[in-house]
Amino acid sequence: MIAIASFVSIGLLASLDQFLDNPYLIASFGATAVLIYGAPDAPFSKPRNVFFGHLFSAIIGVTVSFIFVKCGYMEELRWLACAIFVSLAIMVMKITNTVHPPGGATALTCAMCGFATVEYIIRPIMLGIIVMMIIAYAVNILRGCLIADISEPNGQ
């Protein structure tokens, strides 16, 4: 069941990515799939952590990327941008109690690829996470497991 859920979610997003010629899949979704399908009871796999961990990290990545690009320093200071993006993402996830390790990779993707648009937050991030979470909910219902509400910190 776990492998099927991962196959369906990553396959669907990869298909959208390929056939619509737009980004719908990013590398951090692979790690998210491992957590939400393979370890659904882990604190980092809770819906609140998955959703907000990626969302906050994408917002940080886009905002700081925008600043670096507008100042004209993205290329020569990409190393600094990478360090800032991931560090800020970790800090915000800790403060908001929404730590989701793949979120760090979501922020890092902004630095490495130079994403500086709000569209990146919507697609691939939010669309991809919503697709993956819907599939996770369906799988957990089929397995007879109830997963925590999105409003509960760390599913507690």
Q: Model features per residue range: what roles?
A:
Residues 96-121:
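Membrane-helix boundary connector in multi-pass membrane proteins
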